[in-house]
Amino acid sequence: MTWKGSGQETVGAEPTLWAISDLHTGHLGNKPVAESLYPSSPDDWLIVAGDVAERTDEIRWSLDLLRRRFAKVIWVPGNHELWTTNRDPMQIFGRARYDYLVNMCDEMGVVTPEHPFPVWTERGGPATIVPMFLLYDYSFLPEGANSKAEGVAIAKERNVVATDEFLLSPEPYPTRDAWCHERVAATRARLEQLDWMQPTVLVNHFPLLRQPCDALFYPEFSLWCGTTKTADWHTRYNAVCSVYGHLHIPRTTWYDGVRFEEVSVGYPREWRRRKPYSWLRQVLPDPQYAPGYLNDFGGHFVITPEMRTQAAQFRERLRQRQSR
């Protein structure tokens, strides 16, 4: 399989639907990654599945760069876009912040979860691309927990607390899970209106299923990774692919015969250790990965003996910590 998605346009190349997430361009070392992204043809589309940056000006810079290069850019927010830090020129919070970002994208011609769903009609199509903003509701519970309160208590006891708890305001909703439930209901209503015969590409920053979270080094972090309310969406809404990020574990897996693509870049300290074969991930047409292309866990990077040793040592430390 030939990858063309991180270089200049290739003469005669056919249109491709690409995806990427977790660019985190506010981090030193990641802005050059964004600047290196080019389509392989003038008609390529790009899905940006959240966590572009934290500051509104950096989010604008990143999306503006990409929309000037790709024929269409489709963005969904991650949790980091919804953070309000004291360094942000726009001190807006919660839903007002999300609305501001949607308006920003609208001005640039970038598709968001609030726009009509675009339809990919090139190779691998037709397929309706469904950008979604769903958040999470703490229902991906860690072992030993039967409720959100118990799960959060276990996580705190093990020093696992997402920064969202301090920087992601849910206002005007009372809680982040209340905001999540409103978004899930609104999105489900739109999905139910689709032609059930037409394939979809479901795009969300967070995984629609709990299973991808099993690869997390800190399993308690799953609390901030999605909702069980979307567990059957990939089959119910005829998905040919589910695109997500957030976990910073770039990999391809299949659940119920549906391809799931985790397309994150992650932080420099992460990707420098296990740089993926390509920054951009092909969504359509189906890439048909050759045998041996993906590593043992579906990852898009080589696992070295040193990495295996470090992972085993980490798991042992984690086991000891959890058994205390």
Curated annotation (Swiss-Prot):
The cross-references to InterPro entries, in alphabetical order and at most eight, read: Calcineurin-like_PHP_ApaH (IPR004843), Metallo-depent_PP-like (IPR029052), Pantetheine_PDE (IPR052963)
Catalysed transformations (reactions): holo-[ACP] + H2O = apo-[ACP] + (R)-4'-phosphopantetheine + H(+)
**SUPFAM superfamilies according to UniProt:** Metallo-dependent phosphatases
Gene Ontology MF annotations: [acyl-carrier-protein] phosphodiesterase activity; metal ion binding
Entry EC no(s): 3.1.4.14
Q: Which keywords describe this protein according to UniProt? A: Hydrolase, Iron, Manganese, Metal-binding
Without the gene, what phenotype results?
Deletion mutant is highly and selectively resistant to the amidino-urea compound 1-[(2,6-diethylphenyl)-3-N-ethylcarbamimodoyl]urea (compound 8918).
Residue positions binding Fe cation? D51, N79, H205, H246
Q: What class of enzyme is it?
A: hydrolase
Q: Where does Mn(2+) bind?
A: D22, H24, D51, H248
Cofactor names: Fe(3+); Mn(2+)
What does this protein do, in the record's words? Catalyzes the hydrolysis of the phosphopantetheine group from substrate holo-carrier proteins.
Protein family membership: Belongs to the metallophosphoesterase superfamily.
Protein's UniProt name: [Acyl-carrier-protein] phosphodiesterase PptH
Q: Which gene encodes it?
A: pptH
